[in-house]
Design a protein with these regions (language model features):
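Conserved small/polar residues in nucleotide/adenosyl-binding loops
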Residues: 1-5, 393-401
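A conserved catalytic-core segment of Leloir-type glycosyltransferases
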Residues: 3-65, 189-190, 194-202, 207-208
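Conserved nucleotide-sugar donor-interacting segment of glycosyltransferase catalytic cores
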Residues: 48-125, 136-140, 179
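Donor nucleotide-sugar binding/catalytic pocket of nucleotide-sugar-dependent glycosyltransferases
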Residues: 110, 120-227, 231-233
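Conserved donor-binding/catalytic core segment of Leloir-type glycosyltransferases
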Residues: 234-249
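Nucleotide-activated donor-binding/catalytic signature segment of Leloir-type glycosyltransferases, i.e.
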Residues: 270-307
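Catalytic binding pocket for nucleotide-activated donors in carbohydrate/polymer assembly enzymes
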Residues: 307-310, 314-391
Length: 404
């Protein structure tokens, strides 16, 4: 199925592919000019036009398909124009009347910002849409801002992040707008696929285990990973994992500041991920310096990530900010205790251990401070070695951790 779509001064082909999978029908917008190639994203100036086309094409295709949704759920700046187009143009048609939109923000840092004059030309929107209370922001056009302004509801991926983005520190220059739209803003925490991340059936890990066999079987994954990565093979080592994009958002400046102290003789540190060159080289350096304790795997592998979740004793996420985070949920699923900074979804999903009440699913620290992080890592290590009867490292914990 195909049609033609006007985009400012040009007319573009719109193809629609249909797939039914597990009883759900999926529609895909096709256009080789915009979507040819092997990467979903390109340069920002190209993506600005690509996603303007996509937003308009998706709305235009609905009556052709005979599919009238009650709600259109938009995700991030790439679909930020859908609520704008829906109210500016499409809602005038009988077919579209009553359709509502929801705008979900996964990370407020990414907003789809480009030159205002060029965006006017690309989108075909009239001048009145490019004012400071609509799409204009600091003399540029901002797709995400448009979506937030025009959507009927706005959500983000955790309750704490929904509150944080109303403040200047986390608000990415949109905190005033988030406060203004707070009456329609909600935080809904992310989740993971419990079938995909299941230590009892996961074919990617070395040794399967469940709530009952947790104590007897999990450590075998540690020894197997030590062997594969060339680390000292010793089940008594306290193994910390870090699977992440290597960017400043992830709190890696804290790790860099105290890495020598983290690499104590009884600790092993396994890193998996790619990102900024300075962090990649930092971890490579410590891999060279402590080659029996540190393994820097500067690539990404789904198979290896599962092995790290299953093998480690603790999982480190000291993020500067974290809208939700999924890795802490994955580590919990494998009975690997998260050590996190209390921000965004990390605060919402990890209950800090209370030694007096014997409750908690992980360890946390509040301030963005390297020595505060180091202190909580050492506390987690002390609990691991000297308080084996505590909730976190017993098979009783498996009911809370693996059975999240």
């Amino acid at each position: 199925m195909y049609k033609r779509q006007d985009l400012a001064w040009r007319t573009q082909y719109v193809g629609v592919f249909e797939l039914e999978w597990n009883g759900v029908t999926f529609y895909f917008i096709d256009n080789e000019f915009y979507f040819g190639g092997n990467k979903p994203y390109s340069w920002i100036h190209e993506d600005i036009e690509k996603f303007a086309f996509f937003s308009k094409a998706a709305l235009s295709a609905l009556p052709v398909l005979g599919f009238r949704p009650d709600i259109i759920h938009c995700n991030d700046w790439q679909t930020g124009l859908i609520p704008v187009y829906l109210k500016e143009r499409f809602s005038q048609g009988e077919f579209y009347q009553g359709i509502k939109s929801i705008m979900t923000i996964h990370n407020l840092k990414f907003q789809g910002i480009w030159d205002l004059k060029k965006v006017k030309d690309i989108t075909g929107l009239p001048d009145e849409y490019f004012t400071s209370d609509k799409l204009e922001a600091y003399d540029d056009a901002n797709y995400l801002k448009g979506g937030i302004v025009y959507a009927d509801r706005v959500t983000t991926v955790s309750e704490t992040y929904a509150e944080e983005i109303k403040t200047p520190f986390y608000g990415e220059n949109l905190d005033g707008l988030m406060r203004a739209r707070s009456n329609v803003l909600s935080g809904i925490v992310n989740g993971i696929d419990y079938d995909e991340y299941n230590p009892e059936t996961d074919k990617r890990i070395y040794n399967n285990y469940n709530q009952v066999t947790f104590r007897k079987e999990k450590w075998k994954n540690k020894v197997a990973l030590q062997k594969e990565l060339g680390l000292t093979e010793d089940k008594g080592k306290f193994m910390i994992g870090l699977v992440s994009r290597l960017t400043d958002q992830k709190g890696l400046d804290l790790v860099a500041y105290v890495m020598d102290q983290l690499c104590a003789e009884d600790v092993q540190f396994v890193v998996l991920g790619t990102g900024e060159e300075r962090y990649e080289n930092m971890f490579r350096h410590y891999d060279w310096k402590y080659n029996d304790r540190v393994s820097a795997n500067i690539y990404y592998s789904e198979d290896m990530s599962h092995k790290v979740y299953a093998a480690c004793d603790a999982f480190l996420m000291p993020s500067l900010f974290e809208p939700c985070g999924l890795s802490q949920l994955m580590s919990l699923r494998y009975g690997t205790v998260p050590i996190v900074r209390e921000t965004g979804g990390l605060k919402d999903t990890v209950e800090p251990y209370n030694e007096y009440e014997g409750k908690g699913t992980g360890f946390s620290f509040a301030n963005y401070n390297a020595h505060e992080m180091l202190g909580i890592v050492n506390y987690a290590k002390d609990v691991y070695y000297n308080h084996k009867s505590c909730l976190l490292y017993t098979s009783d914990a498996a009911d809370d951790l693996i059975g999240v």
